[in-house]
Swiss-Prot record:
One GO MF term attached to the UniProt entry: DNA topoisomerase type II (double strand cut, ATP-hydrolyzing) activity
Subunit structure: Homodimer. Heterotetramer of two Top6A and two Top6B chains.
Function summary: Relaxes both positive and negative superturns and exhibits a strong decatenase activity.
Superkingdom, taxonomy of origin: Archaea
Keyword DNA-binding: yes
Protein name stated in the entry: Type 2 DNA topoisomerase 6 subunit B
Gene assigned in the entry: top6B
Recorded family membership: Belongs to the TOP6B family.
Length: 564
């Protein structure tokens, strides 16, 4: 029988980088086409976020050069604010590091893995470092970065500085990758950038394909999106560990001040209510009679906390005083049990929904600009819903765009999360299920699959509930599903009005031509019978036809608008 110390000889601590090196598929590096698209996605989203935060209209150039079979050089350059020299190894070489992962803020990337994951993929497929050229407006820094996977640290293996007489500012990334493939498929780089351009009409994007062909996705809006605002966590959306960890990191003077200043919808008055609820929870736990306990708990759930407290006689005032003292002590001295009681009270209390001013949708006009500029449809409409919350306290917002006809040849569902295209895992995404659940025939689309219709859905949130770390599919959350359906139906009603008018006009044109076809014969016959000039008779009937068609047009529009 082996001894315990022998069993643990192979025990080893694995770094985050080492874990993802062995499990690159979790980051989206699975399949030759998808892996290349993932690299471009990580670099481009970084560029867009950086430009928007700095108030710069993004200009992004992507170059893909074929070096051999399934071997490419990838270059992504932007006109963003640049990266300070000391942050280069952290940005490109350290996993779970970034400017947004620790903040409650809407962003395209959330995990602090993105671009460092791309650097690691390049490194494990070619063994070569990633070349980074960047400037914040001063001298240009050229650095070659590798990841030390054992330590989860970026290492600059070579660095050169250059003068910058023209004041260039931005970042250029160059990396070699193998085991990838460039194709113009629905999951490839070209399609990804096309979809990115639709959702980001303020961006100018260039793509140089491996055959040297230059593709330009022009800017169709000069409006820079307002940067998202960091949002405080809502009491209904936190766990015990959140409260405990935040309290121990807080610099506030008391637990009360910590709760009021670092959570949304908690005021001084709410603290008084919280004290009562925590006291009531404690007293309920001391109640021996299960039947009485259940009745009192029912009252507490219904918000009658004062009645619950009074039912314990004189004891309740002492318990309230004890809890009030907890609120006055330093937050770093908050115990786990006390944090549990606070979160349990949060679940019973009623709060206003979290503020949603920090969410930044694309906007209806910009969706229409993006769809029109790239797809050239004959009709386009968009709907941005009011913000809502899921999981009790996480704000989100849904917007939808529909583009019909024109240069569109078939149906397409364009899925986005915080403006980022989701190209993979469509079958497990709530957007797909919501679009498929719509009865499109009600909106004059006989067959969704064969209709010249593009459906854009963008889900915005500080915490998009992805189904995996690959961030390509949104979980089937009931509140999100319902909001997508409502937005789709709203937009589809506008499309139905347009199609109704289009079909009606086609019918009226055909009808007019049929009637006009017989006018010469009618005019001749009436001329013989009445002696009136043929031209006068023809003009009379033309006016009569036009008048009749106009009346029918107005009546049909009124009926359709009432039905919509």
């Amino acid at each position: 029988m082996a001894e315990a110390k022998d069993l643990f000889k192979e025990f080893k601590v694995q770094s985050v980088s080492e874990f993802f090196r062995r499990n690159a598929a979790m980051l989206g590096y699975t399949g030759k086409i998808r892996s290349l698209t993932t690299i471009i996605h990580e670099a481009v989203t970084n560029s867009l976020d950086a430009c928007e935060e700095a108030g710069i209209l993004p200009t992004i150039r992507v170059e893909i050069e074929e070096l051999g079979k399934e071997h490419y050089k990838v270059i992504v350059e932007d006109n963003g604010p640049g990266i300070p020299e000391e942050y280069i190894p952290h940005v490109f070489g350290k996993m779970l590091a970034g400017t947004k992962a620790h903040r409650n803020i809407q962003s395209r990337g959330q995990q602090g893995i993105g671009i460092s994951g791309a650097v690691m993929f390049a490194q494990i497929t070619t063994g070569k470092p990633t070349r980074v050229i960047t400037s914040t407006g001063g001298e240009i820094v050229e650095a070659w970065v590798k990841i030390d996977v054992q330590k989860n640290e970026g290492k600059i293996v070579k660095k050169v500085k250059h003068p910058n007489p023209k004041g260039w500012r931005g970042t250029r990334i160059e990396m070699e990758v193998k085991d990838v493939k460039y194709v113009r498929s629905r999951q490839g780089v070209y399609w990804y950038l096309k979809l990115t351009a639709i959702a980001n009409p303020h961006a100018y994007i260039e793509l140089v394909e491996p055959d040297g062909k230059l593709v330009v996705f022009p800017r169709s809006s000069e409006e820079i999106p307002k940067p998202p605002v960091e949002m405080k966590p809502h009491p209904k959306g936190v766990m015990v560990d959140d409260v405990y960890t935040m309290a121990h990191r807080s610099k506030r003077s008391s637990v009360k001040r910590f709760l009021v200043s670092e959570f949304s919808r908690i005021s001084e008055k709410k603290i008084e209510e919280l004290i009562k609820y925590v006291a009531a929870i404690r007293l309920l736990k001391s109640e021996q009679n299960e039947e009485i306990k259940e009745k009192l708990r029912e009252k507490l759930i219904n918000g009658d906390v004062d009645s619950v407290l009074r039912s314990f006689g004189r004891k309740w005032k002492k318990e309230v005083e004890k809890v009030a003292k907890i609120m006055e002590k330093p937050p770093e001295k908050l115990t786990w049990q006390e944090a549990e009681e606070i979160v349990e009270a949060f679940k019973l209390m009623k709060f206003l929904a979290p503020p949603t001013h920090g969410l930044r949708p694309i906007g209806e006009e910009n969706i229409k600009r993006g769809l029109t500029g790239i797809l050239k449809p004959e009709f386009v409409t968009a709907v941005t819903r009011s913000p809502k919350v899921y999981a009790g306290g996480i704000p989100f917002q849904v917007e939808v765009g529909l583009a019909y006809g024109g240069q569109i040849s078939g149906s397409e569902i364009l899925r986005y999360a915080n403006r980022v295209p989701l190209l993979f895992d469509a079958g497990s995404c709530v957007i797909t299920s919501a679009v498929r659940s719509i009865d499109w025939k009600r909106y004059k689309i006989d067959s969704f699959d064969s209709a010249p219709l593009v459906v854009l859905v963008n889900v915005i949130s500080v915490h998009v509930p992805y189904t995996s770390t690959g961030k390509q599919s949104i979980a089937d959350i009931e509140e999100i599903y319902n909001e997508i359906r409502l937005a789709l139906m709203d937009a589809a009603r506008k499309l139905a009005l347009y199609l109704g008018g289009k079909y009606r006009r086609m019918y009226q044109i055909k009808r007019r031509k049929t009637l006009e076809k017989y006018l010469p014969e009618i005019a001749r016959s009436l001329h013989i019978l009445t002696g009136e000039p043929e031209e006068k008779i023809r003009e009379y009937f033309l006016k009569l036809i036009e008048s009749k068609i106009e009346v029918e047009e107005v009546e049909s529009v009124e009926v359709e608008e009432a039905e919509a």
